[in-house]
A protein has these predicted regions:
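Short, small-residue-biased leader/transition segments that mark boundaries at the very start
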Residues: 1-12
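Active-site-flanking segments in enzyme catalytic domains
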Residues: 17-163
């Protein structure tokens, strides 16, 4: 397993101290790949989760810890303003059936179906694809704004952050 966190990515090193590996992880009765706890700087990960997405899920959950530590930098209202006026996120990630993790080839502002659930999940999906190096080949203007927002936020935390 590789987090790909080589170098001086201070925002990650300072935000994450422990990774707990477990099986059959769930929250509110719903199976989940991981649960971030920014207070304890801990990431709980289900090692039985779909291997196809496992490393990307690690990056996704790491972003939640970063996001929770730097809410003022990763503002959800600013993020939501990038979307078309007709789009609204769900109230919570477990309040929607949008759970698909396959990367879209036609993005239309979103990188996966799950990224349409909430603003924080959308940010985490963009970050995970950046870290994992599997962005779609064609990126639309909305998704490009989101990518630039994540990169800019990370550089505000750590000027040496390298994606």
């Amino acid at each position: 397993i590789s987090l790909g966190l080589v170098g001086s990515e201070m925002c990650i090193r300072d935000s994450l101290k422990y990774i707990v590996l477990c099986e059959d992880l769930s929250i509110s009765g719903i199976n989940t790949a991981g649960i971030p706890d920014n207070v304890m700087k801990t990431l709980i990960v289900d090692i039985k989760f779909n291997n196809k997405y496992f490393e990307r899920v690690l990056h996704h959950e790491v972003f939640h810890i970063i996001n929770d530590s730097f809410k003022e930098i990763f503002n959800e209202k600013t993020w939501s303003s990038f979307n078309s006026d007709s789009f609204n996120y769900a109230k919570c990630s477990t309040c929607t059936k949008k759970i698909g993790l396959d990367t879209y080839s036609k993005t239309n502002g979103f990188i996966t179906e799950y990224s349409k659930s909430t603003a924080s999940e959308d940010m985490a999906e963009v970050f995970s694809h950046l870290m994992h190096g599997n962005l779609p080949k064609q990126i639309d203007p909305i998704l490009q704004k989101k990518i630039d927002f994540i990169k800019s936020g990370l550089l505000k935390i750590d000027q040496n952050f390298d994606l």
